[in-house]
Amino acid sequence: MVTFSVPRSGTGCTEERVCFSVPDGAVLFAGSRHGVVPAPTASLLVAGLCRLGFSFLVGCAPGVDERFRYTLSLTAETEKHTFVGCAFEKRAVEIGRTGLFASVVVPAEVSPHAALRRRTLWLVKRADLLMLFPDDPETGRWGRGSALAFHAALDQLKPVFVVTSRPPAQSLSYHLLPDRFFGFLDGYWVVPHPVAEGTCDEEL
């Protein structure tokens, strides 16, 4: 388990913190297909999460997915601990040529739109932590795929770190905590409150 400790904002007490633990399993990188993550940011983030013992999940889209696929392919250590979930066979073949393990994770008979949606849900289901870069620079808003990943993670009580200029609204369902991840990446932790009866996710 990896434990994060984040200052609780708005309390007036610098010592009050929210602590939560995440299995050191898989972190999913996701975000806008038009998004741009600077190469140094992606490299530092991947290196830090690798040191904590995480493996990596990422999708087959351009934009944010593509940046992290490239970063993860640069070292043997991250390459062997990365799985790329694909919506289409053509993408899996192309990505496989980069050295990363890529596989189609949806049935062949579904429509392209449904395939993209089911790929996202498949990846969120298998992640322990979601790192989300949802802002679409063309619209200034979150993309639909990013919103889907965000809500799916919260439905499954999984924490999300969101790098965005449009933070989620406050909610009784989760803590919303501004933070600087690893001391360099500004964003917001969205940490669902525990539910005694378990999660509200279902088989996807």
Locations of regions flagged by a protein language model:
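Glycine- and charge-rich intrinsically disordered segments
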Residues: 1-6, 199
